[in-house]
Structures are given as C-alpha cells and as structure tokens.
Amino acid sequence: MADAQLPPGWTLQRIRDVSGDQGAIVLDSNRAAKWVASDPHEVLHPEIVLGFHSLCIVKPVDDDDWYMGSLYDDGSIDCWTAYDDLYEALRGL
C-alpha cells in the first residue's frame, strides 16, 4: 500500500465516523477507475481511494470532486455519482 494516502486534514477514524462504516480503509490508488455516468466512459486517474466493502470513493488527480462507485474483486472501480466535497460523499454512502 505504498501509494495509499488519506485526504489532507482527515484521519481514518474521522472517515469511519462520518461514513458510519468502521470497516473503511484507505486503498492503493494504482488501479483502473472510470466514470460510467458519461458516454463514452471517462478514465479516472485516482489520487486517493477510500474503500467501504463493495463501494469506494475516489478523488482523481487534478480534480476537486469525489466520485462514488463500485469496487470489484479485481480492484477496478466504476464510478457513477460525484460530490463536491468528501464529507457529503461519505454521508452519501
């Protein structure tokens, strides 16, 4: 997990508290991710990935939005909704 990182100003416990998921984890950002709400699908380049069982929240490089999506067994992510800030994304889980 050398590439795994927390968002600036956040702790893992705060992420767990806000999301209500005590099993939340920080995942390696080196994985395939795409925005499937557009056609054609847009490739996302994750900077931060937070895992919540079969869901995840992704913050792409050079993008201020947070994308929620499905986390698959192979580690890939399909994102289908976006939030302006992390707090709202966590509450939307």
What are the roles of these predicted feature ranges?
Residues 1-48:
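Negatively charged, low-complexity tracts enriched in Asp/Glu with abundant Ser/Thr
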Residues 4, 22, 29, 63-64, ...:
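Short linear motifs in intrinsically disordered/low-complexity regions
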Residues 7-10, 75, 80, 93:
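Aromatic-residue detector
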Residues 15, 51-78:
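Short aromatic-glycine-(Arg/Gly/Cys) micro-motifs in beta-strand/loop hairpins
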Residues 83-93:
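A short, charged, amphipathic alpha-helix used as a generic interaction element across diverse proteins
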